[in-house]
Swiss-Prot record:
Region feature (May be important for binding to prokineticin receptor 2): 20-24
Protein name (record): Prokineticin Bv8
Function: Potent agonist for both PKR1/PROKR1 and PKR2/PROKR2, and inducer of a potent and long-lasting hyperalgesia. Shows an EC(50) of 0.264 nM, when tested on neuroblastoma cells (SH-SY5Y) which endogenously express mainly PKR2/PROKR2. Also potentiates capsaicin-induced TRPV1 current, when tested on DRG neurons. Induces a biphasic hyperalgesia to tactile and thermal stimuli after systemic injection of this protein into rat.
Any one GO biological process: endothelial cell proliferation
InterPro entries assigned to the protein according to its UniProt record, in alphabetical order: Prokineticin (IPR009523), Prokineticin_domain (IPR023569)
Length: 96
């Protein structure tokens, strides 16, 4: 029941979010299409989705830069798109 509630909350957040694009469930990057990675859910690391790589100005995780990554990602953020780097910007890390 707890998992069901988490999924419902996730779907509601996505429905009202302008930036979230989810392309499918996954376990590893190789299951996702080009330009995406298999990122952990922000609510449960046991749930992963294929999401787009970061564009300029979007949040990123500095230690998450290899695509495809062989293991299971622990971050809910994908690396930046090719040609961009994940750099500290104020209190957060952003693709630039």
């Amino acid at each position: 029941m707890k998992c069901f509630a988490q999924i419902v909350v996730l779907l509601l957040v996505i429905a009202f979010s302008h930036g979230a694009v989810i392309t499918g469930a996954c376990d590893k990057d190789v299951q996702c299409g080009s330009g995406t990675c298999c990122a952990a859910s922000a609510w449960s690391r046991n749930i992963r989705f294929c999401i787009p790589l970061g564009n300029s100005g979007e949040d990123c995780h500095p230690a998450s830069h290899k695509v495809p990554y062989d293991g299971k990602r622990l971050s809910s953020l994908c690396p930046c798109k090719s040609g961009l780097t994940c750099s500290k910007s104020g209190e957060k890390f952003k693709c630039s």
